[in-house]
Amino acid sequence: MTVLDNKTKLNYQNGYLIYNKKYIFKGKFLSKDQFKIAEICFNTSMTGYQEILTDPSYKSQFINFTFPLIGIVGCNNEDYESWKIHASGLICNELFELSSNWRAQTNFTNWIISQNSCAFFDLDTRAVTKIVRNFGPKNIMLCSEEYFENKGICLLYTSPSPRDAIP
């Protein structure tokens, strides 16, 4: 358990990223839910994660960031592309818990949870990117270790892909 801002307690759980039954990555899962399913894509930007997550073109997608450290700048009210996070969640190598920028109004992890999104981290995102590049974007599942052990892969193959996600 990690304490942030001396107010919010966030529980990181052990979890799994499941891509096409063949590729299963273990990492840390931060979410109010036990699992989430969405299409995966990747982004190679070094900055602008708040803008990327709030961009409506990423609706119903997990964004795999190839830059290794996400969250250090925090979040503010000026860097939104739209009024909320449209991405289903993010995947990154390291999720920074504290903000280190004079413009930050909240830290990144609290913002993710307050927007009902999720994060999956502590894995090699370069390996995930190579899989997506080679086999294409597909629905993946991010889930807690407990959920994976009980229901896991079965649910992934009964979930339809989103169609016409952007109005």
Stretches with model-predicted labels:
Residues 2-159:
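RNA-binding accessory domains that recognize and position tRNA/RNA substrates
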Residues 157-167:
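Single conserved hydrophobic/aromatic residue that forms the stacking wall/gate
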